C-alpha cells in the first residue's frame, strides 16, 4: 500500500534510491523528537490558596501523607482551568467556597516534587466557609494562624510564601 507523503514544501522533499519522492531523514528525526519531548517533558500544575480571614490570619492544612503545615490546594486536572481547580480543591479540602476573584500571587517551579511541576499560588480574601470538613484520608487538620505565629513544623515552601505575602520578602521563582 502506498501512503501519501506528508504535506511538505517541495524544497524539503528528497528522492529515494529508486527515484521515488521521499521524506528526508532529518525531518523524520525532528518529528519523532518533537513527539518524544511532548511525552517526556510534560508539565504538572497545581493551584494553592492562601486563604486570608478578616483578621489577617491564614488557613493552613496538615496532610495525612506528608509532614508540615501547608496551603490547601491540589492539581489541575486535564481540561480544567486553574481557577476551577483552585475552587474545587478548596471546597474539597477545607470546605471553602471562593466568592470573589482570587489574586494570583506567584508561579513557582517545584522541582522537589517533580522536575516539571509548577504551583500557582493565589491569595483568597473573598470566601465563605459554611462547614469544616471532618479529618479524612487526606487532611488531618486545618487551622487559622497569624502570619507571625505559625507552627514550627510548617513546610519550608509555605514558610517562604508567607514571608513573601505578609513580610514583603523578595519573591523566588522556586517553591
What do the PLM-derived regions correspond to, one by one?
Residues 53, 57-93:
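Conserved Nudix-box catalytic region and its N-terminal flanking loop in Nudix hydrolases
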Residues 97-106:
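A short coil-to-beta-strand element that immediately follows conserved catalytic motifs
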Residues 108-131, 158, 165-169:
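Active-site-adjacent beta-strand/loop module that shapes the phosphate/pyrophosphate-binding cleft
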Residues 4-18, 67-68, 137-175:
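Nudix hydrolase/Nudix homology domain
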Residues 2, 16-48:
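Acidic, metal-coordinating catalytic segment for phosphate/diphosphate chemistry
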Residues 51, 121-125, 144:
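Short, well-ordered beta-strand micro-motif
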Amino acid at each position: 500500500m502506498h501512503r501519501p507523503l506528508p504535506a511538505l514544501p517541495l524544497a524539503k522533499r528528497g528522492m529515494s534510491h529508486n527515484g521515488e519522492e521521499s521524506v528526508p531523514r532529518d525531518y523524520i528525526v525532528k518529528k519523532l523528537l518533537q513527539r518524544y519531548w511532548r511525552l517526556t517533558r510534560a508539565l504538572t500544575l497545581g493551584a494553592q490558596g492562601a486563604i486570608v480571614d478578616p483578621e489577617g490570619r491564614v488557613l493552613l492544612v496538615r496532610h495525612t501523607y506528608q509532614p508540615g503545615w501547608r496551603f490547601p490546594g491540589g492539581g489541575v486536572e486535564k481540561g480544567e482551568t486553574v481557577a476551577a481547580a483552585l475552587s474545587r480543591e478548596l471546597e474539597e479540602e477545607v470546605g471553602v467556597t471562593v466568592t470573589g476573584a482570587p489574586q494570583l500571587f506567584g508561579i513557582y517551579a517545584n522541582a522537589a516534587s517533580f522536575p516539571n511541576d509548577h504551583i500557582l499560588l493565589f491569595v483568597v480574601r473573598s470566601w465563605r466557609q459554611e462547614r469544616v470538613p471532618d479529618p479524612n484520608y487526606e487532611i488531618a487538620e486545618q487551622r487559622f494562624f497569624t502570619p507571625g505565629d505559625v507552627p514550627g513544623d510548617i513546610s519550608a515552601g509555605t514558610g517562604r510564601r508567607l514571608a513573601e505575602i505578609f513580610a514583603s520578602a523578595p519573591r523566588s521563582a522556586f517553591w
